[in-house]
């Protein structure tokens, strides 16, 4: 089947922002204007197409990243697909709540460009900065849409100043708002020198284009000059022409801005009010004009299986070998497990076999689906640049590479943060126990930041996630979708243990010899702290065959399993480096199990001698409060072991930045509400792990042991 849309007409984009900036509302307008939906779904009614989970509709927030495909023809004319002139836009609407940061992370990994939304009243908020940094890490070109210009207090100039201060100095407005709050009617296109006025009676589908009013002419010319000057810096021919005073054509200007945006040297800024249907079509035009097609970004790199140092590329072509990355797993009530993936090269037909190079397994693709939020359309094949979902991939997980056995490649996987909060969960009946195990396994498959473990001492099932809301939604889904009835404990901080000094020649010896075949395993290890975030590093330094090769793996595994339960308070141990340096074996009695136990014994002894300490998650907290309550807010943060990082003015309010241990933040929202009569708000996100002060650590350890 030939390609219906040329690759240069593809746009794979994400919509990302802080919670409540209007991402889902903007996506709903895009679906409406591109003809994907015939009526607009509103978030506050619980009817948004992209928020299809019950939990999303009840809470009015986006939890999972819904994917959809639509078609757009530049200059405000949307067309049915198939005419060849339209552009295919694959959109992923991502959550803005910090607890669901994994959804943003995995979406950015497979996108070519992104639109960052701001609330024009609040400007750049903490989670805006977080998603911006995530996009920087994946080098995703992006543009900014300053939304909610219709709200009282909207201030485009202040937003622009905050963008340049906190996100990028290379941000340039290509539109200026006409009015703000109740008086907002549309925008000025600074490149075309025209004013766009949107008609309310057609829900913004029609608009008038008039000359720029006199009072906006100076601002328009300044913005135009700044934008063109910044864009032509990357094109010598245009630079010379511009400096010589020659007028550049609109096509030349757009091409220069496009090149600079794709090179991440230019951030175009637009404005509008999605809820009032103003500015969304112009934003779609800008996506076409300035964000990259798959062929505009460098080909993705990977390595050969079992050869991490041998790098290869997956060229963005239909006639290249097939290569795709699975970026999301979802459980669908009707078809079971859905695997969302992005195709980087080649073609794959439904019903064909693919090779999962990450797992070294061959799998059959049952059906291929084009997703529209939670609705689906069956398709026969996928090609380079497509984002689609497959049914039937049993062993594939988030971050796995799908390719052909003849041309294997492993694409760079995604890195996910560790959970910071734990909850104990107990099934109410025996029937619930079986259902609980299945539910937790499926939910953990979907979400790499959700972990399940069993407490070695109590036998309780412990679930861990990125925050209280994250775990609340997991438990809610477990009860609704999997019909599990369970008792849920209070959220607990996910403490960790580590060591502070190096220890050498620590012995672990496991011997059972009492007639018949016995057990014999003997190891000697060195152990030292490694850098934060390094996890567990194991090095085999054995020489002379004192431990046979087949027993090295079991030693490593024994230590790895022992890491689950630290020596201080039974918390998982992180960031250590172990060197296996010596040992001995017995021709008859040695076994894998004996060496596994010996490894575990050596680790426990080494941990006791290596100055073990307790670590706690520390959160980055931002509080926005009216001046009148600042004293109380600051005093309260200090009483929570908070460290104040700085204070800035935002409109009439003060913004306090601080780092506070997560253990001290439970119940903070209630306290802040009562301190400020409901006028202060806060947001928090994980920052780092830090050693717990001695007195506090003793308190935690004695509580656990009691």
UniProtKB/Swiss-Prot annotation:
GO terms for biological process: ribosome disassembly. Transmembrane segments: none annotated. It comes from the Bacteria. It is found in: Cytoplasm. Its main location: cytoplasm. One of its GO terms (molecular function) is translation elongation factor activity. GTP binds at residues 17-24, 93-97, 147-150. Belongs to the TRAFAC class translation factor GTPase superfamily. Classic translation factor GTPase family. EF-G/EF-2 subfamily. This is Elongation factor G. It comes from Gemmatimonas aurantiaca (strain DSM 14586 / JCM 11422 / NBRC 100505 / T-27). The gene is fusA.
């Amino acid at each position: 089947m030939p390609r219906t849309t040329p690759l240069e007409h593809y746009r794979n984009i994400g919509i990302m922002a802080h919670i409540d900036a209007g991402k889902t509302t903007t996506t709903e307008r895009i679906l409406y204007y591109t003809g994907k939906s015939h009526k607009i779904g509103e978030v506050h009614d619980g009817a948004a197409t992209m928020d299809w989970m019950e939990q999303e509709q009840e809470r009015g927030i986006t939890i999972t990243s819904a994917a959809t495909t639509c078609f757009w023809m530049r200059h405000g004319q949307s067309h049915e697909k198939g005419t060849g002139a339209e552009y295919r836009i694959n959109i992923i609407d991502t959550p803005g709540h910090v607890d669901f940061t994994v959804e943003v992370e995995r979406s950015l990994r497979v996108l070519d460009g992104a639109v960052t939304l701001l609330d024009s009243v609040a400007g750049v908020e903490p989670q805006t900065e977080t998603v911006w940094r995530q996009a920087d890490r994946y080098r995703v070109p992006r543009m900014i849409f300053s939304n909610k210009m219709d709200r009282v207090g909207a201030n485009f100039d202040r937003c622009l100043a905050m963008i340049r201060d906190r996100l990028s100095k290379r941000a340039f407005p290509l539109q200026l708002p006409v009015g703000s709050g109740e008086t907002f009617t549309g925008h000025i296109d600074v490149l075309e020198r025209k004013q766009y006025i949107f008609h309310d009676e057609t829900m913004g589908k029609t608009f008038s284009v008039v000359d720029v009013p006199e009072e906006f002419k100076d601002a328009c010319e300044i913005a135009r000059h700044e934008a063109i000057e910044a864009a032509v810096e990357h094109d010598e021919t245009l630079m010379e022409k511009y400096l010589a005073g020659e007028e550049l054509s609109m096509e030349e200007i757009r091409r220069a801005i496009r090149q600079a945006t794709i090179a991440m040297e230019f951030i175009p800024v637009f404005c509008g009010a999605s809820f009032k249907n103003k500015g969304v079509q112009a934003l779609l035009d800008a996506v076409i004009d300035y964000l990259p097609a798959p062929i505009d970004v460098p080909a993705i790199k990977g390595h050969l299986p079992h050869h991490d140092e041998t790098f290869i590329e997956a060229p963005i072509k239909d006639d290249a070998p097939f290569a795709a990355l699975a970026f999301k797993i979802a459980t669908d009530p009707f078809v079971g497990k859905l695997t969302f993936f992005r195709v980087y090269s080649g073609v794959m037909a439904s019903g064909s076999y693919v090779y999962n190079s990450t797992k070294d397994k061959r799998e059959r693709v049952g059906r291929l689906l084009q997703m529209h939020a939670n609705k689906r359309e069956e398709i026969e094949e996928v090609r380079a640049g497509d984002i689609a979902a497959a049914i039937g991939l049993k062993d594939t997980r988030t971050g796995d590479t799908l390719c052909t056995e003849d041309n294997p490649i492993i694409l760079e996987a995604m890195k996910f943060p560790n959970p910071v909060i734990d909850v104990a969960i107990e099934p109410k009946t025996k029937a619930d126990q079986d259902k609980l195990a299945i539910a937790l396994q499926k939910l953990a498959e979907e979400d790499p930041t959700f972990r399940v473990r069993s407490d070695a001492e109590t036998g309780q099932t412990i679930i861990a996630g990125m925050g209280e809301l994250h775990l609340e939604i997991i438990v809610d889904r477990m009860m609704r979708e999997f019909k599990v009835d369970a008792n849920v404990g209070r959220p607990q901080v996910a403490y960790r243990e580590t060591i502070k000094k190096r220890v050498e020649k620590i012995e672990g010896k496991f011997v059972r010899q009492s007639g018949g075949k016995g057990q014999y395993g003997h190891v000697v290890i060195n152990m030292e702290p490694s850098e934060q975030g390094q996890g567990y590093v194991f090095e085999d330094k054995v020489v002379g065959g004192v431990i046979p090769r087949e027993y090295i793996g079991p030693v490593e595994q024994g230590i790895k399993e022992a890491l689950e339960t630290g020596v201080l308070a039974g918390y998982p141990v992180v960031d250590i480096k172990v060197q296996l340096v010596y040992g001995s074996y017995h021709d008859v009695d040695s076994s894998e199990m004996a060496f596994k136990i010996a490894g575990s014994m050596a680790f426990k002894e080494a941990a006791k001698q290596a100055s073990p300490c307790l670590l706690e998650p520390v959160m980055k907290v931002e509080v926005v409060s009216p001046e009148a309550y600042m004293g109380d807010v600051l005093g309260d943060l200090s009483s929570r072991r908070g460290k104040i990082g700085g204070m800035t003015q935002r409109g009439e309010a003060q913004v306090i930045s601080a780092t506070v241990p997560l253990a001290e933040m439970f119940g903070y929202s209630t306290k802040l509400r009562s301190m400020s009569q409901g006028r202060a708000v806060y947001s928090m996100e994980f920052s780092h792990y830090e050693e717990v002060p001695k007195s506090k650590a003793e308190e935690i350890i004695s509580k656990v042991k009691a």
